[in-house]
Amino acid sequence: LAKRHIKLYLMLVPDKERVYSEYYPDGYTKVNEQAKIEQVYEFVGKYTDIPVVYPIKALEKAKKNHLLFYKTGTHWNHRGAYVAYLEMMKMLKKDYPELRVLKESDFNIAPQFSADEDISNALGLDAKSTFPKEDMTYDVFELKKPTTTVVHEFVNKKLKIETFDYVSSNPANKLKAIFYADSQFLRMSWYVAESFKKMQHIYVGYGRDFDIPYMAEDIEAFAPDILVVETGERFLNRLMKLEMPEQQ
């Protein structure tokens, strides 16, 4: 990637039970003192030159004052995503200090009745009619002055490859970025794009492996300055199959 002037970064997203481990039922004990995600974080930091962010400490601090994950799903809510966004942007700004970081004052933030229902659906529960309204009410972030437009495209329906292409009208934005990221990134992608001239989110959903070699020509044509690979903790194993274009 360096030959193509693309800077690679890694973002590791802890699972909800990692952040809220105090809610494990009595009788459950740790199998290993160090979790796999912690091992990956330490290994990448020690043996590679890839900058990596693992926002566990920021999330643990923020949970004292805010609910960060949906009770009925596996994803963080808007508040949790924003906490992680700040940590990610802190990492990127070390190399690109000109990047704009959105403040809470850039958003209208209000509690709304909303839900992420992947867990409740798996259990056959209608979350909105089963749980109290207060358990389904979370801070929702809306940008006051968005500058981006987005186009959603299915690149390959069979392989479930889809992209979200953002373009900003803000002339101060000069950099281009690609985020190879799963559904956790969907809670922040629309405002992460506010920091870039162009940003593409290549969606790695449905638990599938990274397919960077398949998208290599598209990535090269996009010519990003920044490539961020993000994965949730439960899909860590797919990092073992992560291949960069020049390896093909």
Describe each region flagged by the PLM.
Residues L1-Q248:
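Extracellular glycan-modifying ectodomains
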